[in-house]
Curated annotation (Swiss-Prot):
UniProt family annotation: Belongs to the LDH/MDH superfamily. MDH type 2 family.
Gene field: mdh
Lineage of source species: Bacteria, Pseudomonadati, Pseudomonadota, Alphaproteobacteria, Caulobacterales
Binding site for NAD(+): G11, A12, A13, G14, N15, I16, G17
Protein name in UniProt: Malate dehydrogenase
Top EC class of this enzyme: oxidoreductase
Provenance organism: Phenylobacterium immobile
EC numbers on record: 1.1.1.37
Example of a GO biological process term: tricarboxylic acid cycle
């Protein structure tokens, strides 16, 4: 079972990383 906090943190980190990658590329 995944904890809501872990899912939120992972989702936020993934979203930020994706946006940064898109910006750099």
């Amino acid at each position: 079972s995944k904890t809501p906090i872990r899912v939120a943190v992972t989702g936020a980190a993934g979203n930020i990383g994706y946006h940064l990658l898109f910006r750099i590329a």
